[in-house]
């Protein structure tokens, strides 16, 4: 399957990470992900397939690891030449300090709807993904998505591997499921049934309103 994946891991850090992506899906394409780490940008290159890239994992296997993978399908509705790719998509992670485990994030982008389309990733001007750790104690991650895409784009976000459930409250559930943008669907695979009633009640971002980052 055509696409690209980037994995970012940090151990006992609290550093903002930002990246930009440019991709073109023909046979000679080279996909690049530039990641800024501690003020020093690093670049990973992907050739027509999947390769993972870790930043500062120090080669050490963490005692515990929390991984969130986002599968994203983007359907372009009008031709955009690969040689004239729009503004690259950007992503940003904010990873909390923790003495107990690494935070690990995996992103995999592909276009499964139009496999013969020349550009396998041709977004509108911007797509920003931000992951927020609500509570290291609960080990829950939330996803806050801001979209600068055309309304006709259809984006699906799915939790492929989910964090083990611990007792949490409504505000955390709402933050976890908080959505912003058009045609966005989140499928948490392991949300406890007793919290499903909160989904329809989540109309605001309680964590940000309470001063969260």
Swiss-Prot record:
Part of the gene cluster that mediates the biosynthesis of andrastins, meroterpenoid compounds that exhibit inhibitory activity against ras farnesyltransferase, suggesting that they could be promising leads for antitumor agents. The first step of the pathway is the synthesis of 3,5-dimethylorsellinic acid (DMOA) by the polyketide synthase adrD via condensation of one acetyl-CoA starter unit with 3 malonyl-CoA units and 2 methylations. DMAO is then converted to farnesyl-DMAO by the prenyltransferase adrG. This is Andrastin A biosynthesis cluster protein B. It comes from Penicillium rubens (strain ATCC 28089 / DSM 1075 / NRRL 1951 / Wisconsin 54-1255) (Penicillium chrysogenum). The lineage of its organism: Eukaryota, Fungi, Dikarya, Ascomycota, Pezizomycotina.
């Amino acid at each position: 399957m055509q696409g690209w994946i980037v994995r970012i891991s940090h151990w006992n850090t609290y550093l903002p990470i930002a990246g930009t992506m440019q991709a073109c899906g023909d046979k000679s394409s080279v996909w690049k992900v530039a990641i800024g780490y501690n003020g020093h940008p690093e670049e990973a290159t992907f050739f027509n397939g999947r390769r993972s890239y870790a930043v500062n994992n120090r080669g050490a296997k963490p005692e515990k690891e929390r991984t969130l993978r986002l599968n994203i399908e983007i359907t372009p509705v009008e031709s955009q030449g690969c040689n004239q790719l729009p503004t690259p998509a950007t992503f940003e992670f904010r990873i909390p300090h923790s003495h107990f485990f690494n935070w690990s994030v995996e992103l995999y982008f592909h276009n499964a709807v139009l496999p013969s389309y020349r550009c396998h990733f041709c977004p509108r001007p911007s797509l920003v993904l931000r992951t927020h750790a609500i509570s290291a104690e609960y080990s829950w991650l939330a996803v806050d998505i801001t979209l600068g895409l055309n309304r006709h784009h259809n984006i699906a976000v799915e939790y492929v591997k989910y964090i083990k459930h611990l007792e949490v409250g409504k505000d955390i559930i709402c933050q976890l499921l908080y959505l912003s943008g058009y045609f966005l669907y989140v499928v948490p695979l392991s949300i406890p049934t007793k919290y499903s009633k909160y989904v329809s009640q989540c109309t605001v971002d309680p964590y940000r309103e309470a001063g969260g980052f």
